[in-house]
Amino acid sequence: MALGSRWQPPPQLPPLLLLLALAAGVRGLEFGGGPGQWARYARWAGAASTGELSFSLRTNATRALLLYLDDGGDCDFLELLLVDGRLRLRFTLSCAEPATLQLDTPVADDRWHMVLLTRDARRTALAVDGEARAAEVRSKRREMQVASDLFVGGIPPDVRLSALTLSTVKYEPPFRGLLANLKLGERPPALLGSQGLRGAAADPLCAPARNPCANGGLCTVLAPGEVGCDCSHTGFGGKFCSEEEHPMEGPAHLTLNSEVGSLLFSEGGAGRGGAGDVHQPTKGKEEFVATFKGNEFFCYDLSHNPIQSSTDEITLAFRTLQRNGLMLHTGKSADYVNLSLKSGAVWLVINLGSGAFEALVEPVNGKFNDNAWHDVRVTRNLRQHAGIGHAMVNKLHYLVTISVDGILTTTGYTQEDYTMLGSDDFFYIGGSPNTADLPGSPVSNNFMGCLKDVVYKNNDFKLELSRLAKEGDPKMKLQGDLSFRCEDVAALDPVTFESPEAFVALPRWSAKRTGSISLDFRTTEPNGLLLFSQGRRAGAGVGSHSSTQRADYFAMELLDGYLYLLLDMGSGGIKLRASSRKVNDGEWCHVDFQRDGRKGSISVNSRSTPFLATGESEVLDLESELYLGGLPEGGRVDLPLPPEVWTAALRAGYVGCVRDLFIDGRSRDLRGLAEAQGAVGVAPFCSRETLKQCASAPCRNGGICREGWNRFVCDCIGTGFLGRVCEREATVLSYDGSMYMKIMLPTAMHTEAEDVSLRFMSQRAYGLMMATTSRESADTLRLELDGGQMRLTVNLDCLRVGCAPSKGPETLFAGHKLNDNEWHTVRVVRRGKSLQLSVDNVTVEGQMAGAHTRLEFHNIETGIMTERRFISVVPSNFIGHLSGLVFNGQPYMDQCKDGDITYCELNARFGLRAIVADPVTFKSRSSYLALATLQAYASMHLFFQFKTTAPDGLLLFNSGNGNDFIVIELVKGYIHYVFDLGNGPSLMKGNSDKPVNDNQWHNVVVSRDPGNVHTLKIDSRTVTQHSNGARNLDLKGELYIGGLSKNMFSNLPKLVASRDGFQGCLASVDLNGRLPDLIADALHRIGQVERGCDGPSTTCTEESCANQGVCLQQWDGFTCDCTMTSYGGPVCNDPGTTYIFGKGGALITYTWPPNDRPSTRMDRLAVGFSTHQRSAVLVRVDSASGLGDYLQLHIDQGTVGVIFNVGTDDITIDEPNAIVSDGKYHVVRFTRSGGNATLQVDSWPVNERYPAGNFDNERLAIARQRIPYRLGRVVDEWLLDKGRQLTIFNSQAAIKIGGRDQGRPFQGQVSGLYYNGLKVLALAAESDPNVRTEGHLRLVGEGPSVLLSAETTATTLLADMATTIMETTTTMATTTTRRGRSPTMRDSTTQNTDDLLVASAECPSDDEDLEECEPSTGGELILPIITEDSLDPPPVATRSPFVPPPPTFYPFLTGVGATQDTLPPPAARRPSSGGPCQAERDDSDCEEPVEASGFASGEVFDSSLPPTDDEDFYTTFPLVTDRTTLLSPRKPRPNLRTDGATGAPGVLFAPSAPAPNLPAGKMNHRDPLQPLLENPPLGPGVPTAFEPRRPPPLRPGVTSAPGFPRLPTANPTGPGERGPPGAVEVIRESSSTTGMVVGIVAAAALCILILLYAMYKYRNRDEGSYQVDQSRNYISNSAQSNGAVVKEKAPAAPKTPSKAKKNKDKEYYV
């Protein structure tokens, strides 16, 4: 309870109590003050939060302990002492700094004094007699912890010091004197014990059983054995409150003493109980109270009885928690009286026509809005006053007096000329329809709280306004839901906007003609948008021009600590600085805005500033919601924000506290609105932290910390990081001169303030970094490198908008030699006409001329300026790296990468990549190019990259007038720069630490500035030279690149050593900011000069393929298998096809045609991605409807996992150690073989999953029916021993990327997705008919929105569609070959899968023989035979497929052949596809074979077979051989391309002569085989894998086992190419049914024979030789897994059928 809410201490005891005390010679409870004295009362529970303690004391001691309590020795305590004869209170909460109160009233005068102590959360008040003070502690906790009893007069000696929070209290002197009437709240506490006390302590006369006071009177102990009763508030009197009091006659609520027509009151103020005071009502007197909640008021109509008075009196009582509000008003224009509460003080304004008289009454401590009753009295009386001036005569003036609670009085005088108060308007109580418009009103909002007994009286009549309102007088009008009783009106809780993104949306403000807004705010931050609302743009119809559209708007914003008002009613805006000083000082600031038509005022802390809007319009038409604290994120783009509101464009939301918001006089519950809207970052309180937020150094990575409002703000500019604490690495984009990023904004933006920052790194002296461009004007803000300096250009197109033309584009330069290949930070700050350009914290300032300050733009471009319609000189394209582009608070690069925005297009590469732009190869020393003359007269900046193994060669030469020339050459592995400006030739030699002809790329910079300082920089090492004399280089003739004609070398100057041309590669050639296309721009091209750079290396090395690509050795070079890397390109260094999935989700769906749905036993999936999401679905593959098989790659809790089901339970595998939700690029590789799976994230170790075997009772029952009785037991034992696992992913129907259909959409970028030979993203980019896209999707690398010149042509992303094979193999399979056919284009796509495919058109399901098929007759168990389709090139074939080596063999030699006994039949091979050894085995032209060892199951292969990228290809033959024949290298396979393009190298492994196939059930006789393993496998069932962190060294030996990631697939095709699918041993669901009947009969019979033979072989073999393809599920026996050779007999070759009898393969499984 607040101070004064229950008991107000009068200056002295009430007369009755005082007389009783004097008569009895008051002693009370007597404390002798001796050692060991103490009194112990029950715990004061009210001290915890709200409560009161009161007592009377009489003493002459100057220092003593009165009261003490604490929390038992921890933090909280409360101590009341006598110090120097005055009361001193100390207390604290939550270990905060203790608060101290020292009163001035002396109490050591041996008289009685009344003491009241009030607790209210953090605040505690102390009052003695008429003096009251309060203090507050700044603690985290509001409640005081009370654990001890209440000690009075001393501390018991048995209380240990450790149990006292304030240990010094035990040494304070005990109290000496009398203490009476101790109460906690309304009741006395229980005395638990005492020592050294005399008097009534042992005889509690006021105990409930002995209390003599009746009717609720309060019992008071006056002296030992004597009590008194306090009868106030009871309506009774007498000694024991037993006598009923009678009500007074007349106006009972006023007791006034009048004298000669004047209203008098006591000199010291009419306190309670004093003469002329307003008495508290008794029980017999009726109170007239009303509750006002901000929208209620009542008014008395004075039009029939106007007021004309010279003497007035107004009395009322109020109770409120609100700081501001109108209590009473009457009058208009010149005559009025206004009584209001403003900032917790009572404010009186009286105007009698001669100017306003104002009086302010404030309490000494606290405020009047303490929810306690306060009495107000206002009088106006005629008094004689001595005038001051030349007349020096006495004059009559009116004395105006206002008193609050009788003790606070303010007086003043009005002028005599105007003595009458006239009013014929209304008497408003508690508010008005428009408080802001009332004359003289200091507030704009209505009252919230209780008003009681409002009475107006003059010399003619008296108006009891509260009574009239309650009784419903006809002249009294009531507004709102008035309640005629006092109810608690909750205070308008303040709210805190904790971040710039926080805001609260208020209902639309209808203030067309008039309006008012008032609020309080408190902050320490300099900038922020407080209020904003706007209307519909005028002229926004069809055909209207964006720049001419205007919208009404209203805004208040903080800029640099000053408060600004912005207003536009459609005919011109005003921007008014409303505060004369900065208001971000952390203190509450009151703002009051009032408008009437074009006129109005804004008041800041009672300092009013008038304004007059421009134009003729008087109507403010606002359509949007009224936003408080900021703007919604989506609205920032969709709303056409007025450029005059700078904080809106800069996205600088307000951070701080707001309270007491009133709109048109009506309150707004901000806390309730924030909670209802779920406003993020809006807290329902306001407190200011005293601790420095930056003290803990929260900013990481070099970020600069600055203090905000209860927060720290990290400036991450220049760190390369983003985020709240600079914790997230900023996205880096790499540009090669043909790359760009373009942000295409949804609407035209108009701004007058911009904040731009970015980091860059480049070796070129020229290049565009960032530019805003417009489709309709020449407006631009452009940053570019110009001669190694940073150049800022700001152009505002004045001619277009009809403003006064300026002198042209403003230009600022900063920095120098910024092309040093180091990171630099640039920042641009524009505020209207003011410009700032900072480079690496060095700032240059400038001012723009002219009045036009509005910048229009539609795009933000980097790297290349594509919008060129309004520019005469196009800036040079950028080569280098950009990072951390933030434009007006938006990190566009990171948003584009993460998919947060959908309006960006780019082909620049993410990541810090080595940049080699437009390389060309000079294949011989006699090759060269001739370009136009080099322009290098006054200065020069040249840059290029080169790579060579030649030690010497001429790189660049240009002759000139006289002896002028320039030469750059390579001499003995070092760069020489030779020049002559007319003073004779000079030579500068590069100081590289070693020769640069090391076949690595090197960077060369040659420059000459206007000061004639020459610079030669090789990589990071620089040489400079200053030359005197001539300063100009006057060149003419052609510029030769790479060499000269032979006859010109002899004429070169003597310092030039070259006598031959350059052989190697050149790239990124920059000639004074121009990027020539060396091939297209050449005037002459002599010799072999070709695009690209083919290095001299032709053998696989560890560095041959990047990003874990697998190097495949060819006869005349090598290729890289990039399928499981997510990258593409010749060496797996180009990004794969990349899509950005935006907010709201997107989906890419690849659907197999119903006739071509594959079923696989093995799957391979690889994908790259980056995201900040912790939960999303990346890829999902579903089977046909009703089957239920699926495979899903997802992110859960920031980690990657895969779940799949191929007919059994869900099987999961995940990588819990790799967090992928960090926004960085990650690559996931997944393989499945049956129920076994592997998962690898980036370079983390491979995770493996081997589920336990299971069997299906139904399936077993079906199979068991076909088995003879005598074999049943054997089969049962075998099944139980081995366990069966469902392994086939049946009838795959669709691949879905993005997770939108699963309710967990992915947001970010996905790149290079590969699944079983399909590159779905590449197909989507090619608009494949089987691919459907939906949602917010963006292809990275789409062409720019305008055609670019040859200099800016974007490179085409590679669409690597690997040619693969689909095999059909299982442990025991019946396979027949089918007639080969030439695939169509659809086949080349739909058959592009590399896994085991099993299906049967005759059986509805191929799921492990779940469905029964009729058996057929005949057939024997044979091994699977893989055939090759006809090699006739399809109509759109692009290159002949080649067969990579199996992982067991590919590092060995360049050519591997198969033995004669293991070759497939020749029927499926075309003679033209063979090499020179397609003849008999004993052909003398063929090289002798070389023997090499195999691995594991020893599968063999045939190089003439179609290509594959699945390890399954190498494990499909269940043969166990002990030797493989390797052939020496041979010529490549002939090119089968029909389009004339260069084909891939020929077949890597040459086939030997045709031979019959091996017969089923028989094995070749071989000698024992010793494997060439450098390291044995890891153990049973654990195959070896690549080293997890980096690619393995390619050396002879076994580096990988089948079935693991990073295995070779097929040769990637070139851009946009796809090879034919090769042999497709796939059984589709709905192929031709020819021969179905025959097949069913034959297949059924064959099933029985298979089982019989299997059982027989099982009963007659050892464990190490059974022909189960254990590599399928990674469950192998020890002999197979440790490298030992399995001994078997070789089967004989069966006859190869000359003609396929069926056009469809079929398989059946048991």
From Swiss-Prot:
PROSITE patterns: EGF_3, LAM_G_DOMAIN. Residues 29-1634 are extracellular. Residues 1-28 form the signal peptide. It comes from the Eukaryota. The keyword S-adenosyl-L-methionine does not apply. Disulfide bonds join 206-219, 213-229, 231-241, 450-486, 657-686, 694-705, 699-714, 716-726, 1065-1093, 1100-1111, 1105-1120, 1122-1132. The keyword Metal-binding applies. It holds the Pfam family Laminin_G_2. The chain crosses the membrane at residues 1635-1655. SUPFAM superfamilies: Concanavalin A-like lectins/glucanases (SSF49899). Glycans are attached at residues 60, 338, 841, 1400. Neuronal cell surface protein that may be involved in cell recognition and cell adhesion. May mediate intracellular signaling. This is Neurexin-2. The gene is Nrxn2.
